[in-house]
């Protein structure tokens, strides 16, 4: 029986659209889901005064044990060094904050190194049916769970002043080529330093020289990135290429730009 008011009028049960899970999880609600993955991190990062980041990419499968364990220790060490360097630049603004994909392996090592150095760190996690779970070294208010890979990658690029890319698989390669494309096409509104960590690995996995030799990239594109094989070398590359003026804090977000075509 339908509920009736005292006047005999039927009372209808209604819900606000944004509180309706059936709508929010539907195809029609997709634009709202995408927008929420932009606005929610934006608000949290601004409230935490996170100005810019140094992003660590790398495999979730590289842990403290196993044949590639040295990369875990190096990522942990480098993240600590980056954090102490950032603290020496400014203790009043959150500059060059270590950021990772929020999962295990190299991502965990980066967040761990930052925490052990007494700094903050950011985790942009992705919901997957396997492998990816937030690591234990993340701060709750700086940990973000994404449904969409492209929104997660947008946030990596938005704040990054530098990206250090450790050995990894499909996900790491996806992130590497995305950021190389953004830098090559000058779509980022500010300079970004890219460091490939582990030169023997990267030279075996990706033959950049062959790409240039075949003419599908220019020889100048080989200068889009640096190689490093130890934390001290990687840190020095960052110091030489990332310039932070604490008197003029960086904008909260790196703006995308489309270079003007000139004849």
Region annotations inferred by a language model:
Residues 39-59, 147-165, 180, 184:
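Glycine/serine-rich loop-strand microenvironments at binding/catalytic pocket rims
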């Amino acid at each position: 029986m339908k509920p009736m008011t005292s006047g005999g009028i039927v009372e209808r049960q209604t819900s606000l659209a944004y509180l309706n899970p059936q709508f929010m999880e539907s195809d029609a609600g997709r634009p709202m889901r995408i927008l929420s993955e932009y606005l929610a991190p934006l608000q949290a990062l601004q409230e935490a005064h996170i100005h810019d980041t140094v992003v660590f990419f790398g495999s979730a499968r590289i842990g403290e044990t196993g044949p590639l364990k040295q990369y875990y220790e190096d990522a942990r060490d480098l993240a600590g060094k980056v954090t102490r360097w950032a603290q020496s630049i400014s203790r009043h603004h959150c500059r060059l904050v270590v950021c990772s994909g929020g999962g295990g392996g190299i991502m965990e090592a980066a967040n761990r190194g930052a925490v052990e150095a007494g700094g903050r760190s950011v985790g942009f996690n992705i919901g997957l049916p396997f492998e990816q779970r937030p690591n234990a070294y993340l701060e709750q208010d700086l940990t973000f769970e994404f449904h969409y890979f492209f929104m997660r990658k947008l946030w990596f690029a938005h704040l990054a002043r530098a990206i250090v890319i450790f050995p990894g698989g499909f996900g790491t390669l996806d992130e590497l080529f995305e950021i190389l494309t953004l830098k090559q096409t000058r779509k980022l509104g500010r300079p970004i330093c890219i460091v490939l960590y582990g030169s023997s690995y990267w030279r075996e996995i990706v033959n950049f020289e062959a790409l240039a030799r075949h003419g599908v990239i220019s020889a100048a594109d080989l200068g889009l990135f640096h190689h490093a094989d130890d934390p001290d070398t990687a840190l020095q590359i960052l110091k030489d290429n990332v310039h932070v003026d604490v008197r003029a804090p960086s904008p909260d977000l790196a703006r995308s730009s489309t270079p003007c075509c000139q004849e």
